[in-house]
């Protein structure tokens, strides 16, 4: 009987990074998916990154994950969002060529040592007592493993809705997974239904591009991967159009035919990616909504109209599309739809994304109530890495809220749960000045190297960068000016008699590296990427120093571990609400307990006192 260390079920974004992470750690890994040709498929929007999401991709890359490199190899319109704002909230994004992305992902995985890939429709999981030990396909073939990672996307009892149509499917043209859903319900897990949607796909040649506003790519593309020197894929523009009052009238007149508004869908959709029906109802005072017309590839005649996902019938979709400027003669290649699917309440998971009730089983991606490729891949990496560590007898790998956006997301999921699909924003991170996209490698690559998660090539590139950064910082710290000298050079600083080094001068808003090169030509030898890093560090230095005190306090609370078998019913001073929520979430640390809604400071004090008494009694 062949037994793998880790089996990953599902070849979407979570599954790809899960399988790659497991294999990089040396675990014998098997990736099982319905169809080999759909590995890395971009089921919805052909884009990677954005606000908050771009940070996740940088962090995935810093841990030597695959999404960033694949996005760089397939990106056809790179744009840095929030460029006019501070570096902490800037978000790298690209539209991808859908076919190039899929091909690049499959190439990455096929070249990964320790990874085998097979086509199989998995319908059941296998258990020995309370531990998951493998999976079984629809033909009854068993696959045995020490650890299993489940990344099912929207396939768990997936149901497509379009007007009055109901089509069982995981996505258009692919069968749902019924058996796996039944298995999970049989484990007595808290589960529910969520929904997401996608717009129609349009024929490129039938759009009046000349009449529309064009949005070009950035002149200098900003890659996702710290391993990418330059973007070599041809860059294109997309177009911008808007709905009209006529569009809104057609939609409003046909709301009863929308699956979302007819009551056919029970699951909640993503708040920050609403359907066009939702937009018309919720923002009734607005006469138009923006639509980005995004080509799906360099050699693809398909266009993705970003901003008008819908579950209206085909004829209504056609009618409202023809009222949109530039789309008056449009031909639809495939109409939009909503899809409803099962998910597991993520409070059933621990910080490694392993089920609390069943050892050896990890969940990642939309099955945990998230939305988005980036959120899925980040969870996949953490789940895959921890499954491999578990299978090979090593300590788990956990990222905290002060380490990474990945840590913020996982902590949000396992302590607060979800009532709607969760997506990442920079505003979710209380330490976002420290958790920037530009320093993701400095925060996380050393952890990946220590763990064995990073390749030798990644480690070598990182070490060279850090050497160059150290030399540049040393140079910058040894060059300084007095206020009088600064004034003579045209720099306006406080007249306090204090000498200021380059790093201190850079903290002034009107002082940049290029300006200082005019004073000290030797600074011109520093590479642009390193000088930019020093500028950003200087800009945030004062704020980060203050934030470090908050991080230290946070880590003190995170260091207080709460026993897994803690009986909250036996702790005096807890309200019924606090007791119920603590029992439900089973927080692993005092810090996690503090982030549960309804758990007051008084409740935390009572829990801490109880744990201390229990610890003292045991000793």
UniProtKB/Swiss-Prot annotation:
| Chain residues that bind NAD(+) | 269-283
Keyword entries, A-Z: Cytoplasm, FAD, Flavoprotein, NAD, tRNA processing
Single Gene Ontology BP annotation: tRNA methylation
State where FAD binds. Answer: 10-15, 122, 177, 366
Q: Which SUPFAM superfamilies match?
A: FAD/NAD(P)-binding domain
Any one GO cellular component localisation term in the record:
cytosol
This protein's major location comes to: cytoplasm
Keyword tRNA processing in record: yes
Q: Where in the cell is it found?
A: Cytoplasm
Pfam families in the record, alphabetically?
A: GIDA, GIDA_C_1st, SAM_GIDA_C
- What are its cofactors? FAD
Listed GO MF terms: flavin adenine dinucleotide binding
By sequence similarity, the record places it as follows: Belongs to the MnmG family.
Q: What does this protein do?
A: NAD-binding protein involved in the addition of a carboxymethylaminomethyl (cmnm) group at the wobble position (U34) of certain tRNAs, forming tRNA-cmnm(5)s(2)U34.
* Subunit description: Homodimer. Heterotetramer of two MnmE and two MnmG subunits.
Name of the featured protein: tRNA uridine 5-carboxymethylaminomethyl modification enzyme MnmG
- Give the species this sequence originates from: Maricaulis maris (strain MCS10)
Gene symbol of the encoding locus: mnmG
């Amino acid at each position: 009987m062949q037994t793998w260390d880790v089996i990953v079920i599902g070849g979407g974004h979570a599954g790809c990074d899960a399988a790659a992470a497991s294999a990089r750690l040396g675990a014998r890994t098997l990736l099982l998916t319905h169809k080999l040709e759909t590995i890395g498929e971009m089921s919805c929007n052909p884009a990677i990154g954005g606000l908050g999401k771009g940070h996740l991709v940088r962090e995935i890359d810093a841990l030597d994950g695959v999404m960033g490199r694949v996005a760089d190899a397939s990106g056809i319109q790179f744009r840095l969002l929030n460029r006019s704002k501070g570096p902490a909230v800037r978000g790298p994004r690209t539209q991808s060529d859908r076919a190039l992305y899929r091909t690049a992902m499959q190439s990455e995985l096929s070249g990964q040592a320790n990874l085998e890939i097979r086509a199989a429709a998995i319908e059941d999981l296998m258990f020995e007592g309370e531990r998951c030990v493998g999976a079984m396909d629809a033909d009854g073939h068993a696959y045995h493993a020490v650890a299993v990672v489940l990344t099912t996307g929207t396939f768990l009892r997936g149901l497509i809705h379009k007007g009055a149509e109901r089509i069982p499917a995981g996505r258009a043209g692919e069968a749902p997974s019924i058996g796996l859903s039944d298995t999970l319900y049989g484990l007595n897990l808290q589960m529910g239904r969520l929904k997401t949607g996608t717009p129609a796909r349009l024929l490129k040649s039938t759009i009046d591009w000349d009449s529309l506003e064009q949005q070009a790519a950035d002149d200098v593309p900003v890659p996702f991967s710290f391993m990418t020197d330059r973007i070599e894929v041809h860059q294109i523009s997309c177009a911008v159009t808007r709905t009209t009052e006529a569009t809104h009238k057609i939609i409003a007149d046909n709301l009863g035919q929308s699956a979302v508004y007819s009551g056919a869908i029970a699951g909640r959709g993503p708040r920050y990616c609403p359907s066009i029906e939702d937009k018309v109802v919720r923002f009734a005072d607005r006469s138009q909504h923006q639509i980005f017309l995004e080509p799906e590839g360099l050699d693809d005649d398909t266009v993705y109209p970003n901003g008008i996902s819908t579950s209206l019938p085909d004829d209504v979709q056609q009618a409202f599309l023809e009222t949109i400027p530039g789309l008056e003669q449009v031909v639809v290649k495939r109409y939009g739809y909503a899809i409803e699917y099962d998910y597991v309440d993520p409070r059933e998971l621990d910080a490694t994304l392993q089920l609390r009730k069943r050892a050896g089983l990890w969940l990642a991606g939309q099955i945990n109530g998230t939305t988005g490729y980036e959120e899925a891949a980040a969870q996949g990496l953490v789940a895959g890495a921890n499954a491999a560590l578990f299978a090979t007898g090593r300590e788990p790998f956990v990222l905290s809220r002060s380490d990474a956006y990945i840590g913020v997301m996982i902590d949000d999921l396992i302590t607060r749960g979800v009532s709607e699909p969760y997506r990442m924003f920079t505003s979710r991170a209380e330490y976002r000045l420290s958790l920037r996209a530009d320093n993701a490698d400095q925060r996380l690559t050393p952890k990946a190297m220590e763990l064995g998660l990073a390749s030798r090539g990644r480690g070598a590139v990182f070490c060279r960068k850090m050497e160059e950064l150290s030399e540049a910082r040393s140079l910058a710290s040894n060059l300084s000016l007095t206020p009088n000298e600064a004034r003579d050079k045209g720099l306006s600083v406080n007249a306090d008699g204090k000498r200021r080094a380059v790093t201190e001068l850079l903290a002034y808003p009107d002082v940049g590296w290029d300006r200082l090169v005019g004073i000290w030509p030797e600074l011109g030898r520093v590479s642009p990427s390193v000088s930019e890093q020093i500028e950003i560090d200087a800009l945030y230095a004062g704020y980060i120093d203050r934030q470090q005190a908050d991080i230290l306090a946070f880590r003190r609370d995170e260091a207080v571990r709460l026993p897994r078998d803690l009986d909250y019913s036996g702790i005096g001073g807890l309200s019924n609400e606090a007791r119920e929520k603590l029992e439900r979430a089973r927080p692993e640390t005092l810090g996690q307990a503090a982030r549960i809604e309804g758990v007051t400071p008084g409740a935390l004090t009572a829990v801490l006192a109880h744990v201390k008494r229990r610890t003292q009694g045991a000793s």
